[in-house]
Amino acid sequence: FYLLLSNKNPWLPARDLSHEAKLRLFCLPHAGGGASMFSQWSSQLPDWIELLPVQLPGREQRLSQPASRNLLDVVHTLGESILSLVEEPFALFGHSMGALLAYGMAARLRDMGRPQPHMLFVSGSAAPSMRDPERLAGLDNDRALIADLRQQGGTPQEVFESPELLRLTLDVLAADYRLCRRFRYRGRAPLAHPLHVLAGRDDDIDSTRLEAWQQMAGGAFSLSWFEGGHFFIRQQQAQVLATIERALGRRLEEVSHAAPAAC
């Protein structure tokens, strides 16, 4: 079940409490999205995974707050806000823009000397070193943004039919695209933990851009393909969650076997 935490930590508006949890899974949304995109995940994940959807400023419960202007600022502030929650085993998942944020968080925690995630899941995103700077070119007006929403899929039809909902969606999407356009990759040392890429077969991200994530992984690297386009995580939700569950289960076993025996 969910416990609202918005008055304590605005980045984590709802926390999936499970007394049997062995690992926390922080989930970061795509451009234009919010924590609610993960609302159905809790009931489909096992009790040993505690789901922690991340809410970015300027949307849903944080609609009254100004949208972020810099990805690094988001990473730094979010990293600070979850420090008390990463002392226990955890993993990071991010889709599209959220994948960049999840990667940035893992790197930030490492640079701070803090615990590292057991695993990083990056979904529907080219590696930071291989992002296409032309992908978002021209997406700076309502007509272009609406066309992009329709092409990407994943936006409910009722959003297009409601002027109010559409306005909110376009404003958040435009702010997030500005955030992404300002992103510049600066080479970093590989991360020390496993990295798992999830991708849609019909997405327009070239496979070489996905495989380039391996350069970021100092630990094990894996890539899973799913039927569908950019929002395959909705079209194939059950398969995506089963993949995450299996990967985390194996990783917990590896870590427990590698831990020194108690004296």
Identify the residue ranges that each predicted region occupies.
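Domain-scale detector for complete catalytic domains at protein termini or as standalone homologs
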Residues: 2-93, 100-263
